[in-house]
């Protein structure tokens, strides 16, 4: 398995971040330079969503973890490996703040070889994506 993550502590509650993230997944909000999401059914456990990364072809992701308002994860098969994206919004020790984490796990045969090749390119926009989500949450409040 190969993994990477990006984490930020922000001055918003997990609930506010979760609500905004669900609007992104539902296609109600499109983040600048972010992935575009088009759900095929109501967003929740097992939901199938068409995700279109900016400038790339669409892929089908499936929601595999759903723990409102703290964790959502989705998975896609790609080139013989499984890519799992986990988005978490956890309360920080300081009241009113949260730790936002976006994590990528690449699993399956050959993941140790494929992960370092494709993973950094996939995850390079994680910092910008978190910043855009936080900005959208502030506007949405």
Outline where the language-model segments fall.
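A conserved amphipathic terminal alpha-helix motif
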Residues: 99, 105-141
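Short, exposed beta-strand/loop patches in secreted or surface proteins that constitute
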Residues: 38-42, 62-65
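Short, intrinsically disordered, mixed-charge
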Residues: 19-26, 68, 128-131, 135, ...
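Generic recognition of short, well-ordered alpha-helical interface segments
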Residues: 12, 58, 124-128
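Hydrophobic-ligand binding "helix-grip"
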Residues: 52-99, 105-108, 135
């Amino acid at each position: 398995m190969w993994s990477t993550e990006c984490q930020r502590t922000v001055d918003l509650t997990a609930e506010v971040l979760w609500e905004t993230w669900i609007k992104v997944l539902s296609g109600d909000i499109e983040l600048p330079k972010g992935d575009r999401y088009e759900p095929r059914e109501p967003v929740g456990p097992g939901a199938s969503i068409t995700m279109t990364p900016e400038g790339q072809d669409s892929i089908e992701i499936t929601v595999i973890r759903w723990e409102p308002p703290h964790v959502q994860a989705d998975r896609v098969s790609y080139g013989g490996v499984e890519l799992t994206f986990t988005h978490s919004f956890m309360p920080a020790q300081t009241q009113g703040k949260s730790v936002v984490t976006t994590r990528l796990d690449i699993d399956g045969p050959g993941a140790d070889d494929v992960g370092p090749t494709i993973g950094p390119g996939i995850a390079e926009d994680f910092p910008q994506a978190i910043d855009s989500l936080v900005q959208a949450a502030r506007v949405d409040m």
